[in-house]
Amino acid sequence: MEKLVLVGVDSGATKTEAVGMDTTSQVCVFTTEGPSNPSVVGIEKSSAVIARAVEKVLTSLGYEKPTPHIVAVGAAGVVNKSYADVLRKRLSVLSGVSADRVVVFEDVVAAHASVFLSSDGVVGILGTGSCVYGEFAGHSVRVGGWGHLLGDEGSGYR
């Protein structure tokens, strides 16, 4: 049976955390890197930090030239699909992971999915920035998350 390799990344303004799992052997590894919010550090640095985290996770799982089935990135600072697509393509180039195996979401959307899967609910992110996101009856609402210049009340930003 082919090993199914999954990598999840939480990309933020303070730090980047990545976790990987090989579902055949149930091995789980975790690594932390520096900030990778593309709105703060730029697309190039963001992509490089995330790619380094992905590489560390895959190396820890014992792969020299791994091909994960999916790399899912929840990234702060990614507020539209075109920006997410630019980050996805750049990350693919740097990591060597095929672009069709990389998905990039806004961090608060990824947080919602991790808690509620496809059900209704509300989540808040209160880190370097702040944002609240909810889904109900097929509709979504996002409040905040616009950065410190426009207002990040409730965040840890100084």
For each predicted feature, which ranges?
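Conserved phosphate-binding catalytic cores of ATP/NTP-utilizing and phosphoryl-transfer enzymes
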Residues: 1, 100-123
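Short glycine-rich, Thr/Ser-proximal phosphate-binding strand/loop in the N-terminal lobe
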Residues: 5-52, 140-141, 145-147
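Short glycine-aspartate micro-motif
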Residues: 6-10, 68-72, 121-125, 132
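Short beta-strand scaffold segments in enzyme catalytic cores
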Residues: 16-21, 113, 124, 130-135
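A glycine- and small-aliphatic-rich helix-loop capping segment at beta-alpha/alpha-beta transitions
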Residues: 22-27, 86-96, 118-122, 137-142
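N-terminal phosphate-binding loop and adjacent alpha-helix
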Residues: 30-66, 77, 81-86
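Glycine/GP-enriched mid-protein hinge/lid loop-to-helix segment characteristic of carbohydrate kinases
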Residues: 42, 120, 131-158
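Short beta-strand-loop/turn "lid" adjacent to the catalytic site in phosphate-handling enzymes
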Residues: 58-95, 101-104, 115-116
